[in-house]
Regions:
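Immediate post-signal-peptide N-terminus of mature secreted/exported proteins
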Residues: 16-77
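Charged heptad-repeat coiled-coil "stalk" segments of single-pass membrane proteins
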Residues: 57-138
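C-terminal amphipathic alpha-helix
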Residues: 116-178
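Sec-dependent bacterial lipoprotein signal peptides
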Residues: 1-16
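Short amphipathic alpha-helical segments
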Residues: 14, 25, 32, 171-178
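Long, hydrophobic, amphipathic alpha-helical segments used as structural scaffolds
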Residues: 39-42, 46, 107, 114, ...
């Protein structure tokens, strides 16, 4: 009977896990998701889309304003300018390698903290402080990466149709009969 109680207590204590386990798991999951979003964005071709936008922007800069082409300047160029600025902002914020390294480092830190907590190497207060520090470092980064990736995916969804549209516009610029 005594052994049965020991086994029951062992399972009850084991089922409890360690302090802040759920929060650590959530932070680890969110960090991994942000890293996957970032890697997926680059594998889906954001760099080639940006190169196309740069090409269209450089062509647009050569066009001289005149009344014949005023609608293009008022409408088409504004759309081009918006897409180009948003995409440029993405590449100016930080490189893929920079964001990946920050997220990967954060992921390593969370895993190390989980290991220390699981092994009982830290007391509950130290775990709480370390977890809060990780949250302070990672949550703004995760938020920025996820929102930026979502915005870039939205721009990329429109890219193919806009790329074709702008190419036709350039082709017809000098020769309206095309």
């Amino acid at each position: 009977m005594r052994n049965l109680w020991k086994i029951a207590i062992f399972f009850i204590v084991g089922a409890c896990g360690f302090p802040y386990e759920a929060e650590m798991n959530q932070l680890e999951s969110d960090t991994q998701e942000a890293l996957s979003n970032l890697q997926g964005l680059y594998s889906s071709g954001i760099e080639s889309d940006y190169a196309d936008l740069e090409r269209h922007a450089s062509i647009a800069r050569t066009k001289i304003f005149d009344s014949i082409h005023e609608p293009y300047f008022r409408n088409e160029f504004e759309v081009l300018k918006y897409h180009y600025r948003q995409t440029s902002r993405w590449f100016e914020l930080q490189s893929q390698a920079g964001w990946e390294s920050e997220l990967s480092y954060g992921l390593e830190q969370i895993k190390a903290l989980k290991h220390d907590a699981e092994q009982g190497l830290m007391d509950e207060e130290a775990i709480r402080v370390a977890l809060e520090n990780e949250k302070v470092a990672l949550i703004p980064l995760i938020s920025e990466v996820n929102s930026s990736c979502a915005a870039m995916r939205e721009l990329m969804a429109e890219h193919d149709s806009l790329d074709s549209h702008w190419q036709v516009m350039w082709d017809r610029w000098e020769n309206p009969n095309l």
